[in-house]
């Protein structure tokens, strides 16, 4: 199991937890829209660090993006396995061809 899979499992386990007991549970309690908003905020922070060129800060913000992506997905009952299956299906396909196939 990868660290991302372990994190996804931890996020999923927090869905029913007391919001006072964990940040993840608190996000879930605020609803999927708030989870999506927080993901967007973290993505913007990662973009800023990418533009600035600070590798360590970008890596840290990217970790936050991955965490908040998992929370947002879980809030809508989409699993990491589902996302990985989409990536696997796209593997080996030209990005241009794949995008054209979406219609």
Swiss-Prot record:
Species per Swiss-Prot/TrEMBL record: Cereibacter sphaeroides (strain ATCC 17023 / DSM 158 / JCM 6121 / CCUG 31486 / LMG 2827 / NBRC 12203 / NCIMB 8253 / ATH 2.4.1.)
Annotated localization: Cytoplasm
Keyword Amino-acid biosynthesis: yes
Family as reported in the entry's similarity comment: Belongs to the PRA-PH family.
Catalyses which reaction(s): 1-(5-phospho-beta-D-ribosyl)-ATP + H2O = 1-(5-phospho-beta-D-ribosyl)-5'-AMP + diphosphate + H(+)
NCBIfam families per record: histidine_hisI (TIGR03188), PRK00400.1-3 (NF001611), PRK00400.1-5 (NF001613)
UniProt GO cellular component terms: cytoplasm
Pathway recorded for this protein: Amino-acid biosynthesis; L-histidine biosynthesis; L-histidine from 5-phospho-alpha-D-ribose 1-diphosphate: step 2/9
GO biological process, one term: L-histidine biosynthetic process
EC top class named in words: hydrolase
InterPro entries in UniProt: HisE, PRib-ATP_PPHydrolase-like
Enzyme Commission no: 3.6.1.31
SUPFAM superfamilies per the UniProt record, alphabetical: all-alpha NTP pyrophosphatases
Single Gene Ontology MF annotation: phosphoribosyl-ATP diphosphatase activity
PANTHER family: HISTIDINE BIOSYNTHESIS BIFUNCTIONAL PROTEIN, HISTIDINE BIOSYNTHESIS BIFUNCTIONAL PROTEIN HIS7
UniProt keyword list: Amino-acid biosynthesis, ATP-binding, Cytoplasm, Histidine biosynthesis, Hydrolase, Nucleotide-binding
Record Pfam families: PRA-PH (PF01503)
Protein name as annotated: Phosphoribosyl-ATP pyrophosphatase
């Amino acid at each position: 199991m990868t660290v991302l899979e372990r994190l996804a499992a931890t996020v999923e386990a927090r869905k029913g937890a007391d919001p006072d007991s964990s940040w993840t549970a608190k996000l879930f309690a605020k609803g999927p829209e708030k989870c999506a908003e927080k993901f967007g905020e973290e993505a913007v922070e990662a973009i800023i660090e990418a533009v600035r060129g600070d590798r360590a800060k970008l890596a840290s913000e990217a970790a936050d993006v991955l965490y908040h992506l998992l929370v947002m997905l879980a809030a809508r009952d989409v699993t990491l396995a589902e996302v990985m299956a989409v990536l696997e299906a796209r593997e080996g396909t030209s990005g241009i061809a794949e995008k054209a196939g979406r219609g």
